[in-house]
Amino acid sequence: MDAADSARLKLAIDAKRRPSEIEIGLPAQSAGSADERSCEGVAKIVSAMVSVYDPMYVSVSPREYFPRQVFDDKPGVGWMLYLPKVLTTQQVPEARELIPVPEAGRKQTGTIIVSVPDAVFSVDNAEHVEVANRIEIRLVDQDLLPAFADL
């Protein structure tokens, strides 16, 4: 398997109590099954990582999205972004879906912000990039997106 065809997982752990970041980079076309590549399937992976590592954020996007994100000094939304904050549609109306973490039945400690719930995020789709960019701008306007320096 070529490295360009595989997913990338970056987990940054330092002397703090929890990892400052988890980034999941997806190839442009994933070799996994449709279920594994679905919004629901990837959100389950993010939720599981959050329950184990309690990170400051988790970002899920193709590698090619990085130069297209709005802010160089903050995490990008890409396909999904987990933040350890309870967020509402009133705060982030541009989000196509907000998934509470943990799931129903337990106290919510964070939110997975989804830019594209019905397809795999693609930088070749201008609408996907535009939605992710609008979410990033909204989060910064509301002081909800931390800078890397603050993580």
Task: Tell me what each language-model feature is.
Residues 64-151:
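C-terminal interaction module
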Residues 1-64:
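Internal, hydrophobic cores of structured domains that mediate oligomerization or house catalytic pockets
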